[in-house]
Amino acid sequence: IQGTIGASAQIGRTQGFDDAVEAHDNWTTLAQQSGEFTQAKGQEVMESILKQSGDDIDVVYCENDNEAFGAIDAIEAAGYEVGGEEGQILVMSFDTTNAGLTDTLSGKITLDTECNPLHGPRVQEIIEKLEAGEEVDKQAYVDEEMFAADDTVTSIKVDDADYEVTTITQDIIDGRAY
């Protein structure tokens, strides 16, 4: 379930998904539709996909938590289960909102990839350094993580880099600033 078509997050996340599908001969994309980054549209899109391909769906790739919430609602309303057990539909998401991580902890979201919203103070620091005539790095990377319900997958390789997957706990959720 894609985000709003043309949004930078949609473009990057869709490209990452398409690249992964292309790299795996045993992966098939059954449908690709925009959920417009909303729960309501995510649910509507998932309902449509379930009518077309319900028993063939193994994984639903949502480009944000709101779409994942809608997809989960549709999957469960159609009588399917979400989660990591055999025969269930796995839901992947982005954002790591508090509610998204809570669904990850419960096993409804299998993997939630962070989109850290706390860039403001870091950008302010860079601007202040530039205004003071100091040199700054040409690129600034944002610390982001991936969270899973269990430790089945401990890292994910993207290009030539390995990224750790953290098993979510209630302590992690409670300790986050957002």
Residue ranges and their predicted role:
Residues 17, 31, 35-102:
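Hydrophobic alpha-helical
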Residues 1, 32, 106-117:
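Short beta-strand elements at the ligand-binding edges of bilobed clamshell
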Residues 29-32, 91, 112, 146:
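Conserved beta-strand scaffold positions in the cores of enzyme catalytic domains, especially
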